[in-house]
């Protein structure tokens, strides 16, 4: 299946699911790696590089490649290259941001929201066990944080505010710049989990007064197993992983050079292609949401519509069916989608995000999430709209709904 934009004409095989898939709409769980990224990574995987900490020529070349990737990622978020710390994932970056900062902070109070990624929420819960207090700010019916509610939650003992840039489960873009303006100048650090948003919506660490920002490589169509935390100069952190002095002492262990180089290329492509690709994906998103609401009785969009939503994200709740049954039926017909966050799905628990926006248990059971990406076509959207209504009708009939 050919992609519609850019210079890479061939869709990666990983998006095909063994040749069956007619529509791959689970990019938030795994984004196929861009072939342009793979091409740059290949020499590093085939033995053409050294250790970036070594002093010989291959090591110096490896360090130059590492620093080049750092610069590309910094350009994507408008930050300084020296602030980029490479990690193995955005989850690790979130853990380092919260627990690493808390270990050096004088204050013992944190502010976050009830809809954060589980890596942020579970880090906060772990800090609570260590004697910190945490304020969990509620959201409105579309999952949006009120900056004034964040301001009201701040105390004289607040050390850190952590608010995601956007929800990976319902697509809500948060008012990060407004929160940053409230935090700026109060001696409080501001952390943003930017997974899902960076490369799709404009985000600048300086304009939004961000001190710590977490990124995922795969979310940018880079290789999995790589992430980064951007840290503003003079922001103090304690490492979670100790050993050597790699990554300025913040993250020990030899860097995964092929993955890091790939992440740098992915970041550069995302920066250059963001405006055009986001507009294309927003059109597909609206086509899908409008079509589902029009053809599936009682289907309701979760999260906002329009500019307040991530351009690649469409999520709905469908009463009278269970998401697992719908997804299995869709999969048998060549459509890959999800019920929300892949990380949360592993627990088998009801979505904390859906609970936060007022979806009760029965409604949450019918939560479906479709996320698009660089190779998504209008034909794939139409395949979902052709198949989903009949799937829901059949399952409702079987359930007696």
Where are these regions (language model features)?
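Pyridoxal 5′-phosphate
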Residues: 1-401
